From Swiss-Prot:
Cofactor note: Binds 1 zinc ion per subunit.
Family classification: Belongs to the aldolase class II family. MtnB subfamily.
Function per UniProt: Catalyzes the dehydration of methylthioribulose-1-phosphate (MTRu-1-P) into 2,3-diketo-5-methylthiopentyl-1-phosphate (DK-MTP-1-P).
One GO process term, biological-process aspect: pentose catabolic process
Any one GO molecular function term: aldehyde-lyase activity
InterPro entries reported for this sequence: Aldolase_class_II_sugar_metab, Aldolase_II/adducin_N, Aldolase_II/adducin_N_sf, MethylthioRu-1-P_deHdtase_MtnB
Catalytic reactions of this protein: 5-(methylsulfanyl)-D-ribulose 1-phosphate = 5-methylsulfanyl-2,3-dioxopentyl phosphate + H2O
Entry's EC annotation: 4.2.1.109
Cofactor section: Zn(2+)
Pathway: Amino-acid biosynthesis; L-methionine biosynthesis via salvage pathway; L-methionine from S-methyl-5-thio-alpha-D-ribose 1-phosphate: step 2/6
Keyword Zinc attached: yes
UniProt-recorded name of the protein: Methylthioribulose-1-phosphate dehydratase
């Protein structure tokens, strides 16, 4: 019996991977992607796969707690995905690139990146004017993923209007109501992060 919704979401994640890799935002086997299905299961990339060369067998299923449903090993950062889905019931996709601008910017600032008065902010869900200000928190990297996931989830619970967060020296996470929405956020945010690095005098 075919799991049609899973197959559809897997195809969308594969396409997103090709797009993101084509821009150099997931080098080597970095990054991880997921999509939440209607029944609460989560389609997520298998650990260690190159995101620009994903195949259907490179997408697996986990439950809402991040436990494998097919015996394979999910992304090392699965708990960061499940935390986002708990905090945002409307979210049905999470994308995590290791993009150059977000990684570099996290070396230039501490605590948070402030994005303000950019027209492209309107690419983010719920924003309809450039005259706005969003805070993108920057968290120190941590190889203890459960500890990092708890710290991030606690922040997200306390703060409204968060569209993304950066892990220092690592990359960023963003989410949306669909894979297409999350991908739009990735593209817009990486552009804005690049502009912010230039404002710090860094030429790319």
């Amino acid at each position: 019996m075919h799991d049609t919704e899973f197959e559809t979401r897997a195809a969308e994640l594969i396409e997103a991977g090709r797009f993101i890799d084509g821009r150099g935002w997931v080098p080597a086997t970095s990054g991880n992607f997921s999509a939440r299905l209607g029944d609460g299961r989560i389609a997520i990339t298998v650990s260690g796969r190159h995101k620009g060369r994903l195949r259907p067998e490179d997408i697996m299923l986990v439950d809402a707690a991040g436990r494998s449903l097919d015996g394979r090993k999910p992304s090392a950062e699965t708990l960061l995905h499940t935390g986002i889905y708990r905090r945002y019931p409307e979210a049905h996709a999470v994308l995590h690139p290791h993009s150059p601008a977000s990684t570099l910017l996290s070396r230039l600032v501490s605590g948070a990146v402030i994005l303000e008065d950019y027209e492209l902010l309107k690419a983010l869900a719920g924003i309809d004017t450039h005259a706005t200000r969003i805070v993108v928190p920057v968290f120190p990297n941590d190889q203890d993923i459960p500890r990092l996931a708890l710290k991030i989830e606690e922040y997200l619970v306390r703060h409204d209007g968060v569209h993304a967060y950066i892990i220092a020296g690592h990359g960023f996470y963003t989410w949306g109501k669909s894979v297409a929405d999350a991908l739009r956020h990735v593209e817009a945010l990486e552009y804005l992060f690049d502009l912010e690095t230039r404002m710090h005098g860094v030429k790319r």
